[in-house]
Amino acid sequence: QKYRPKDGETGLPVLKIKELRQGICDASSELCSPSIKSEYIIHDGDIIFSWSGSLLVDIWCGGTCGLNQHLFKVTSNNYDKWFYYLWTAHQLDRFIAVAADKATTMGHIKREELEKAEVIIPSKCDYKRIRTLIKPLFDLIISNRIENRKLTALRNILLPKIMSGEIDVSDIDL
C-alpha cells in the first residue's frame, strides 16, 4: 500500500477487487491514509469500475474507503450516476472480450479501449423523461444496499450476544 496511515491516523480501508466483489471492506482490508486526495476517496453510491484482472462495474455501498490503483471511480459532470453506470454495465461484455484477447497473464482494459466505447445520448427531453423513471429506482437500490449493510453489522453484533444468553429475548412477543 503506497499511502499507509501515518502514526496516530485512523486509516481508511482500501477498496480492492476483493472488497468490490463482496460489497464491503472487512478486517482483512488494507488501510490507507485518510489524507489521500479527495478524488481517491470512495463514498456510498459511487460507481466503481475494475479494469484489471476481474473486469466488473458496481455501485459501491460498502462505506467510505480509499481507491486502489486497479479501480476507477466513474464520474461525470454532465450526467447522472444511473446513466453512466448503465452504459458502463452495457459495455462490460465487450470490455471483457477485448481484455481476454490481449491477456498474457491477467486481462485488463486500456484507457484507449474505454475511449472507443460508444454511448447514445438521448435528447434533453427524453433524458428527463427517462430520468424520472430510473433515478428513483437507482436511488432505492443504493438506499437498500446501505440499509442491508447496516442491518448485517447489527445482526453480527447482536446474534452472538443472543446466542450466548448475554441478551435475553425470551419475553419478546413476535
Residue ranges and their predicted role:
Residues 1-5, 11-44, 66-67:
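Sequence-specific dsDNA recognition surfaces
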Residues 8-11, 23-25, 50, 117-118, ...:
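Enrichment for repetitive, rod-forming helical segments
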Residues 32-35, 74, 138-142:
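Short, contiguous acidic/charged loop-to-helix segments that flank catalytic cores in large enzymes
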Residues 79, 86, 90-94, 100-103, ...:
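Amphipathic alpha-helical coiled-coil/heptad-repeat segments
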Residues 16-17, 35-93, 99-104, 110-111:
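A short beta-sheet element
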Residues 2-4, 16-18, 73, 110-111, ...:
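Basic side chains
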Residues 26-27, 61, 131:
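Short conserved micro-motifs at the rims of enzyme active sites and ligand-binding pockets
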